[in-house]
A protein has these predicted regions:
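Bacterial N-terminal signal peptides that target proteins for export
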Residues: 2-11
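N-terminal signal peptide c-region/cleavage motif recognized by signal peptidases
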Residues: 19-21
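Histidine-rich, glycine-flanked metal-binding segment
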Residues: 34, 38-77
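His/Asp/Glu-enriched, well-ordered alpha-helical/loop segment
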Residues: 92, 99-111, 237, 279, ...
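Polyanionic/metal-chelating signatures
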Residues: 124, 129-262
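Glycine-enriched alpha-helix->loop->beta-strand junction motifs that scaffold or abut catalytic
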Residues: 256-262, 280-286, 314-316
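Conserved small/polar residues in nucleotide/adenosyl-binding loops
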Residues: 390-392
């Protein structure tokens, strides 16, 4: 079957996936629309794609000797980015033998990297692109160790290379239930974390002595020291999973002495209380807007409009699903909940696309010349969960 016949067939099936970046030939996407106000159709747009990148975009773009793709009047957006999920690391939440996302019974797991355990054949992965999620940050979870290890960036679109970046960020857990390994006190947990970072800093300073076995002994393994060294040098982001405002404030102030550490707050149920401080220091917050119930003493300040407060203050935000056991559509559902509670529609879309791309320091997330052609086509409002994705 010729390529054009294949495209026409795809246009008839809302559940069929079409990976534009995987096409070697130049493609001209016609009859598409940019998102307008509140999810309505905006300006008509034609997009020229070559070698998986947007070469030109606008109302007057034309090209010869290209394959043509009729978007059928659909709204086009960049693919969504899930800023925190464990898909590919587990299949069944209650079955321990299917979970590979955490290291148990160790004091420090900073050297663990989830990409070594990722299963690109997971039964859960095909659900991601059907909800417009084309990339995801796969995060480790914590057992007794507060430092849980490094996350990885993956692509969910069939035909693309699955692993996009093997080592993206280090993850540190300091929530109410993450204090067992520190004797039951979150205060001691933070002190131990700072001591580990100090030890990693000494490891970086004493490399020559260490290599010649002349350095004072370290309590951490070489793998953990190197992983934390990457954080100290700013080579890896540090994602701190924490909810209580008092804890967030202590984390921010405690890490100020590590000048190159790049902090991100994940969860941040009470981060809205510190919005001016976080905005001033340009510390991003990764939110699960649906996680808004005050189910613990860490979350007494939970509220539905936290994304609105943070965004209005100028805090960079992005949305995450946090678990693979619910539909990826929870990302768009979260965006819709945020809009219903005051977040501007365009800012909600940004928190799924350009926002996370900037926070994670990865390309894409924008419809612009030179960007990766990571395109998703919708038959209506891109954050309305009752509408369908047409193509990806």
């Amino acid at each position: 079957m010729k390529m054009m016949d294949g495209l026409r067939s795809i246009a008839l099936l809302a559940t069929t996936l079409f990976a534009l970046p995987a096409i070697a030939a130049d493609v001209l996407v016609e009859n598409a629309f940019l998102p307008g106000a509140e999810g309505a159709k905006g300006e008509p747009v034609t997009i020229l794609i070559s070698e998986g990148r947007i070469q030109a975009i606008g109302a007057e773009v034309t090209a010869n000797d290209v394959e043509r793709f009729d978007a059928g009047g659909a709204i086009v957006t960049p693919g969504y980015i899930d800023s925190g999920t464990s898909v590919g690391l587990a299949e069944v939440s209650g079955l321990g033998t299917s979970r590979d996302g955490r290291v148990e019974e160790v004091r420090n797991a900073a050297g663990f990297n989830v990409w070594t355990a990722l299963n690109e054949g997971s039964s859960l992965i095909p659900f991601a692109p059907t909800d417009g999620v084309t990339r995801g940050v796969i995060t480790p979870s914590a057992d007794e160790a507060n430092f849980a290890g490094e996350s990885a960036l993956v692509r969910f679109v069939k035909g693309d290379k699955f692993l996009a970046r093997a080592s993206l960020a280090q993850h540190l857990y300091l929530r109410e239930w993450n204090r067992r390994g520190a004797g039951g006190s979150r205060g001691n947990a933070l002190q131990v974390v700072l001591e580990d970072l100090d030890e990693a800093a000494r490891f970086l300073r004493d490399q020559r002595q260490y290599n010649s076995n002349k350095a004072r002994p370290f309590s951490l393994s070489t793998r953990e020291l190197r992983a934390l060294g990457r954080v100290i040098k700013g080579e890896r982001l540090l994602v701190v999973h924490v909810d209580r405002a008092a804890d967030i404030r202590k984390v921010v102030s405690s890490f100020e002495r590590f000048e190159d550490v790049k902090l991100i707050i994940a969860g941040g149920v009470e981060a809205w209380r510190l919005a001016p401080m976080l905005a001033e220091q340009s510390i991003p917050v990764l939110l699960n807007v649906l996680d808004n119930v005050p189910e613990s003493f860490d979350r007494l300040g939970a509220r539905l409009d936290s994304a609105t407060i943070l965004d209005k203050a100028g805090v960079p935000i992005a949305f995450m699903s946090t678990t693979p056991y619910s539909e990826f559509r929870s990302l768009t559902q979260a965006a819709g909940v945020a809009v219903a509670n005051g977040l501007r529609w365009d800012r909600a879309l940004r928190a799924l696309t350009e926002g996370p791309a900037e926070i994670w320091g990865i390309e894409g997330g924008r419809l612009a010349e030179g960007e990766v052609a990571d395109l998703v086509f919708w038959d209506g409002d891109p954050i309305e969960i009752m509408l369908s994705l047409i193509h990806i």
